[in-house]
A protein has these predicted regions:
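Noncatalytic regulatory segments and standalone regulatory/sensor domains
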Residues: 1-10, 29-36, 62-133
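An acidic, carboxylate-rich microenvironment
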Residues: 23, 40, 60-61, 109
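Glycine-rich, N-terminal phosphate-binding loop and its surrounding beta-alpha-beta segment
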Residues: 48-51, 59, 73-75
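A short, surface-exposed loop/turn module that caps and links secondary-structure elements
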Residues: 53-65
Length: 133
């Protein structure tokens, strides 16, 4: 779960509205084993001004316009997909994992690690009421 929190923080930074990993971790509810609750984490993101939802879908079904998106990987790992190049099974994904620099991964390689869940996140749009026009 810590990997997911870290990658949600990276995604907020890519959206130019950074929320520190520590802030997310501190505000999320935990169970008896101190594991973070996914629903609580979603609510914390909403409180920071982000619309978000988890979706079960195939890797090729993730829209390239929805970037950045957090993908859930095997072994309690996660990654942020910041860009998608190509189409179908010829796709190449630009991913960020932890503190490593962004790198490209083929569809075949990423699909072998992908659990089938992705977390979409974007800033909430709010009306600007500063002008009378």
């Amino acid at each position: 779960m810590n990997s997911i929190i870290k990658h949600l923080a990276i995604a907020t930074k890519l959206l130019n509205q950074p929320v520190a990993e520590e802030a997310l971790a501190a505000n999320v509810a935990r169970d008896r084993n101190l594991n973070a609750n996914i629903q609580s984490l979603s609510e914390v993101l909403r409180s920071y001004g982000f619309e978000n939802h988890i979706s079960r879908r195939k890797l090729v079904e993730i829209p390239s316009l929805a970037m950045p998106v957090i993908i859930i990987l095997h072994n309690d790992e996660a990654a942020v997909v910041s860009e998608v190049k190509g189409r179908g099974e010829e796709r190449v994904y630009v991913i960020r994992q932890g503190d490593a620099p962004a790198h490209e991964v083929s569809h075949k390689d990423l699909e072998a690690q992908y659990l089938g869940f992705c977390w979409f996140i974007k800033p909430k749009l709010t009306a600007d009421h500063r002008s009378e026009l």
